[in-house]
Design a protein with these regions (language model features):
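Conserved class I S-adenosyl-L-methionine
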Residues: 127-138, 153
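Conserved SAM-binding loop of SAM-dependent methyltransferases across substrates and taxa
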Residues: 138-150
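Conserved beta-strand signature within the Rossmann-like core of class I S-adenosyl-L-methionine
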Residues: 231-239
Length: 277
């Protein structure tokens, strides 16, 4: 069972209004479960319980998701000695996002992560055939693409990200959906092993430029072009409209490089660019 400040506020509100039972989500907004309020305890379906102090702790940690284990709270976060990075699952009003050393991997200001992903995929609809999701993260792109595609290959090189995804109810499809093949690998190297014209669509949603400059390189774009089928479509995330990195217009530079390797009909779409081969 997972709980965040959203559910904690609901529970404390119910107690304040002297309500004895309330339906809340224990899987980060996918489903609802009945919670009983008795003798200052909040009793969960499996018999575990929390008190007001524990719920107040959750509310104070409003960028953290908590596992309920043995009537105690465990933050869904970790620090990697190998990467020297801090990873945590951050709640929203629907699907959570992942934060890596303070940087959130989804656009959360104007959209929830799930809606953000839908819009990215919608930029190159209809999705069909075999799809490449270059940078998995929590897997929302792969999961939503699998609804329409015949098969999805998704790549993630950071095992810590995969570990966080294992705790996320919204990422369940990564590990159970037979239409999704998750590769624990660096897409910069892995793409060289893919056959020519292997994919009908590609969704390239890389980390920001400062964290993965090679995924914005001409060399990598040549590989994207090579593995995409004729008339296949590419979505490339570039960031907020008008945003610049060190005074560099990233979208403009990406546009130029995509055209240089052969992509056509390059156009601005939701937080990125869409184009065809």
């Amino acid at each position: 069972m997972i709980i965040s400040h959203f559910q904690a506020q609901e529970l404390l509100g119910a107690k304040k209004n002297k309500i004895n039972e309330i339906m809340i989500s224990l899987d980060l907004n996918l489903t609802k479960s009945k919670i009983k309020i008795q003798n200052n305890f909040f009793i969960f379906p499996d018999g575990q319980h929390l008190d007001e102090k524990q719920l107040e702790k959750i509310i104070k940690n409003d960028t953290t998701c908590f596992l309920i284990i043995d009537n105690s709270l465990l933050k869904i976060q970790l620090f990697s000695e190998q990467t020297k990075k801090f990873y945590k699952l951050v709640p929203t009003r629907d699907a959570p996002t992942i934060e890596i050393s303070g940087i959130r991997m989804h656009v959360t200001k104007n959209f929830t992560p799930w809606e953000d992903t839908k819009r990215k995929i919608g930029s190159i609809s209809p999705i069909r055939g075999i799809v490449l999701d270059t940078c998995m993260g929590l897997g929302y792109t792969a999961i939503l693409s699998s609804t329409y595609a015949d098969f999805v290959i998704t790549c993630e090189k950071d095992e810590n990200v995969i570990e966080v995804a294992k705790f996320n109810p919204w990422s369940k499809g990564l590990f159970e959906n037979k239409k999704i093949n998750m590769l624990k690998t660096d897409i910069f190297e892995e793409i060289k092993l893919f056959k020519d014209e292997m994919f009908n669509e590609i969704i390239h949603d890389p980390p920001r430029l400062s964290l993965a400059s090679q995924l914005y390189s001409l060399e990598f774009y040549k590989q994207l072009y090579r593995v995409l089928k004729k008339d296949g479509k590419l979505y490339h995330y570039t960031g907020s409209p008008g945003s610049k990195f060190r005074k560099i217009d990233l979208a403009k530079n990406v546009d130029e490089r995509l055209r240089k390797v052969g992509f056509k009909n390059v156009k601005k779409v939701h937080y990125g660019l869409a184009c065809k081969k």
